[in-house]
Design a protein with these regions (language model features):
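Surface-exposed amphipathic alpha-helical tracts and adjacent flexible/coil segments at the periphery
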Residues: 2-32, 36-43, 61-62, 68-96, ...
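Alpha-helix capping/helix-boundary segments
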Residues: 109-110
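Glycine-rich, positively charged N-terminal anion/phosphate-binding segment
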Residues: 47-66
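Gly/Gly-Pro- and Ser/Thr-rich, intrinsically disordered tail segments characteristic of DNA damage-repair
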Residues: 86, 120-121, 125-134
Length: 417
């Protein structure tokens, strides 16, 4: 299985890098196995709606990460226009002083400011910079960067070639949404919603539904949906990426960090995906020669899938089968309904915070770090006043219920939609 390049060097366990749009997601990702998380600060990022961190939240997140031997990176990967860089030096110094492990940047102006104004703060090149060959990585290495996040358009063959010719750290996306534009450089939102996607304002215009017509505007025209030529309105977005079945190739070709997309997604998603990739990496590193991708890992990822899954550009250029142009296959997603706050071993009662509606009679599944899964039917529930209830309808309400097996704080609860 291992190629000649791998045989010449000791296999390195890749970092599992998870998204964390909030402090809660940061703690969840680390609890479920992430070695590092990436977050957004209050400026210079590309996810203005991701619940970006204050400096106080960063400090708490960094302290939590250090307690668990994990790292925190900050994405500051916007494309700057004139005046946008004002205050960047102070921003980067604050990140360094709060203990951030690295900053993820794409704009050369911000890279220069960070290197000059905040020496000692490691810099990682963002995927927005579209690094696709080893000469580019060598250039950024000479500029003092410690890591490059490869463009999502890089193939597995190119990953291997890049690793053969440079020793700078390589980070690559292995799971999550795929931008339809080149490495995220998109201007659709600028035209459609007057928001600059390259400065944090992406409104996901590619995922909107568009009407298709047989003639331009201003002429007599017919909707192709109305005429029956197409079944659904048109969108131009890609299916999501999942590389769970290709862990050996990623490790053997020298990818140092496995990046999971999704700072705006839920703790259900973050916990599940982090848990799966940790299990897969641990299994491979324990016994590379006898490694097998388990079906339960694949099934688990489908429980949080929002779209169909494919391998992006790693093995070929995506065809129409990897694009969401029209009708979508129904995905067997689950609904996140709660999290465990505490558990009383004597009474076998769990205290739960509700996240979505569930009721007596529902079949629910508990899961925690390390694939400690079990299912049961909800038979009894009580609210905080001790009153018996049939439903848990109120967002974030706290309730108690008996559980079939011991659970721990931080365990999640879901049910099939």
């Amino acid at each position: 299985m291992m190629n000649e390049m791998t045989a010449k060097r000791k296999l390195k366990r890749p970092e599992i890098l998870a998204p964390a749009g909030t402090l809660e997601k940061l703690k969840t990702a680390i609890h479920y196995g992430a070695d590092a998380v990436y977050i957004g600060g209050n400026a210079y990022g590309l996810r203005s709606r991701a619940g970006n961190f204050t400096y106080e939240e960063m400090a708490e997140g960094v302290a939590f990460a250090k307690e668990h031997d994990a790292k925190v990176y900050v994405a500051a990967n916007m494309v700057t226009h004139e005046g946008n860089e004002e205050g960047a030096g102070e921003f980067f110094r604050s990140l360094r002083d709060v203990g951030i492990s690295a900053v993820i940047v794409s704009d050369p102006a911000l890279i220069e400011i960070c290197a000059t104004e905040a020496p000692g703060l490691p810099i990682h090149l963002s995927t927005q910079a579209s690094a696709t060959n080893f000469e580019t990585l060598e250039f950024w290495k000479e500029e003092g960067l410690e890591r490059v996040v490869l463009a999502r358009e890089v193939s597995m063959e190119e990953v291997a070639e890049i690793r053969k010719n440079t020793d700078i750290e390589i980070e690559a996306f292995i799971h999550g949404a795929m931008c339809i534009s080149y490495s995220g450089r998109c201007t659709l939102s600028n035209h459609m919603s007057m928001r600059d996607a390259n400065r944090g304002g992406c409104s996901q215009s590619c995922r909107w539904k568009y009407g298709l017509f047989d003639m331009p505007f201003g002429q007599e025209r017919n909707s192709l949906t109305d005429t029956g030529e197409i079944e659904e309105e048109f969108s131009m977005s890609a299916v999501d990426m999942s590389m769970i079945e290709h862990i050996p190739e990623l490790i053997e070709n020298g990818v140092d960090s496995f990046k999971i997309e999704g700072r705006m997604k839920s703790i259900h998603y973050v916990s599940t995906v982090s848990n799966v990739y940790k299990a897969a990496v641990d299994s491979y590193m324990e016994d590379p020669e006898n490694y097998v991708c388990k079906q339960e890992w694949i099934d688990e990822l489908w429980k949080v899938a929002q779209r169909e899954l494919a391998t992006g550009f790693y093995y070929n250029t995506p065809t129409e089968n990897e694009q969401l142009f029209g009708e979508r296959r129904k995905i067997p997603v689950y609904k996140f309904v709660g999290e465990v706050l505490s558990y009383d071993e004597a009474t076998q009662i769990a205290t739960i915070r509700q996240r979505n509606l569930f009721s007596v009679g529902d079949e629910i599944e508990f899961y925690g770090p390390g694939f400690s899964h079990f299912s049961q039917t909800v038979e009894i529930m009580h609210n905080e006043e001790g009153e018996s209830i049939d439903r848990a309808p109120n967002p974030m309400m706290v309730l108690a219920m008996p559980v079939a097996q011991p659970v721990k704080p931080g365990d999640m609860i879901r049910k099939r939609k």
